[in-house]
Curated annotation (Swiss-Prot):
N6-acetyllysine: modified positions: 231
Name of protein: ADP-ribosylation factor GTPase-activating protein 1
Gene3D superfamilies assigned to the protein according to its UniProt record, in alphabetical order: Arf GTPase activating protein
Keyword Hydrolase assigned: no
UniProt gene name: Arfgap1
Source organism of this protein record: Rattus norvegicus (Rat)
Known role: GTPase-activating protein (GAP) for the ADP ribosylation factor 1 (ARF1). Involved in membrane trafficking and /or vesicle transport. Promotes hydrolysis of the ARF1-bound GTP and thus, is required for the dissociation of coat proteins from Golgi-derived membranes and vesicles, a prerequisite for vesicle's fusion with target compartment. Probably regulates ARF1-mediated transport via its interaction with the KDELR proteins and TMED2. Overexpression induces the redistribution of the entire Golgi complex to the endoplasmic reticulum, as when ARF1 is deactivated.
Length: 415
């Protein structure tokens, strides 16, 4: 890249000798120069000058290339106006020259020698210049044009070295291309040509990328499955150990202790005996209920609940009925103290077991006045209700007075 000193010198030179326009086409603000002649050219013309070869035109960039002091001196010695005036002053100059003819002419060779001599600080004269004997090449047919397609063969006859001409042709073909490629190398790259195998390469690359993605996902899935299986196995083993420990503590150890102490058979025998007693009690009670239902007899007093559990006191208040020895109907309206009766004395039709006679509460003696003479009759008959004397009623009332719980028999039925 040009140094600040180089930029300063070139800025001063540009302001002189019509250097602010292109020497070839007249474009404004040229950024390229031909150091050999000290002239300023544009970007397009710089490519054409490169095609001439460095022995005819050495091209440099004003801002992008590094400069030497001798090159700056050549720029001061040359210039657009100086070169044009020098060419027009020569006898062999023709305005219709092509670019190749112009810079291959004797006039151009003389000006090159002048610029190089002045840059070295020497005096130059036309008579003493070695370029006086310059003999330009004489081609049979001149095919050089400003825009020759790349790769077009050149039909020129050379008077110099054949190898040099071959190098010149190769250099010209590399720099002077077609119109669409003339900016190649200056920020504009030509896209590569598509080949037939590009499609296959792109397909294979897509296949490789897809397979890589699949393998990556499969490896991730396998690692996740492995981690899950390991975690599940650890949890299962932990639960199994906990279950085994609980079973050992709650079942096996107590059983072992009982076996050692000899208590396990006692526990088994006690459990079996309890179960048998419960089964026996349930079976006997069920059979007794069935036989009672079909025989029409009342339940035996031996199977009845204790006193205080009569149907008059079925509300369950045992504390109030604990002192009552007789049922309510046995003392209601009776003149004499009640006597003990057989278990079947509650029946209306059964005979009295103690006397061998029918019970006094039978319907056969309903309304009879001889209730007082029947001493062995049951006191809860209907005849006692009608035939009892006032004294009997008073005694019954007096007897029933202390037992307040018996008078409230109807109130305890929760009817």
């Amino acid at each position: 890249m040009a140094s600040p000193r180089t930029r300063k010198v070139l800025k001063e030179v540009r302001a002189q000798d019509e250097n602010n326009v292109c020497f070839e086409c007249g474009a404004f603000n040229p950024q390229w120069v031909s150091v050999t002649y000290g002239i300023w050219i544009c970007l397009e013309c710089s490519g054409r000058h490169r095609g001439l070869g460095v022995h005819l035109s050495f091209v440099r960039s004003v801002t992008m290339d590094k400069w030497k002091d001798i090159e700056l001196e050549k720029m001061k010695a040359g210039g657009n106006a100086k070169f044009r005036e020098f060419l027009e002053a020569q006898d062999d100059y023709e305005p219709s020259w092509s670019l190749q003819d112009k810079y291959s002419s004797r006039a151009a060779a003389l000006f090159r020698d002048k610029v190089a001599t002045l840059a070295e600080g020497k005096e130059w004269s036309l008579e003493s210049s070695p370029a006086q004997n310059w003999t330009p090449p004489q081609p049979k047919t001149l095919q050089f044009t400003a825009h020759r397609p790349a790769g077009q063969p050149q039909n020129v006859t050379t008077s110099g070295d054949k190898a040099f001409e071959d190098w010149l042709n190769d250099d010209l073909g590399s720099y002077q291309g077609a119109q669409e490629n003339r900016y190649v190398g200056f920020g504009n790259t030509v896209p590569p040509q598509k080949r037939e195998d590009d499609f296959l390469n792109s397909a294979m690359s897509s296949l490789y990328s897809g397979w890589s993605s699949f393998t990556t996902g499969a490896s991730k899935f396998a690692s996740a499955a492995k981690e899950g299986a390991t975690k599940f196995g650890s949890q299962a083993s932990q639960k199994a150990s906990e279950l085994g420990h609980s079973l050992n503590e709650n079942v096996l150890k107590p059983a072992q202790e009982k076996v050692k102490e000899g208590r396990i058979f006692d526990d088994v025998s006690s459990g079996v005996s309890q179960l048998a007693s419960k089964v026996q009690g349930v079976g006997s009670k069920g059979w007794r209920d069935v036989t009672t239902f079909f025989s029409g007899k009342a339940e035996d007093t031996s199977d009845r609940p204790l006193e205080g559990h009569s149907y008059q006191n079925s509300s369950g208040d045992n504390s109030q009925n604990s002192t009552i020895d007789q049922s309510f109907w046995e003392t209601f309206g009776s003149a004499e103290p009640p006597k003990a009766k057989s278990p079947s004395s509650d029946s209306w039709t059964c005979a009295d077991a103690s006397t061998g006679r029918r019970s006094s509460d039978s319907w056969d003696i309903w309304g009879s006045g001889s209730a007082s003479n029947n001493k062995n009759s049951n006191s809860d008959g209907w005849e006692s209700w009608e035939g009892a004397s006032g004294e009997g009623r008073a005694k019954a009332t007096k007897k029933a007075a202390p037992s307040t719980a018996a008078d409230e028999g109807w109130d305890n039925q929760n009817w």
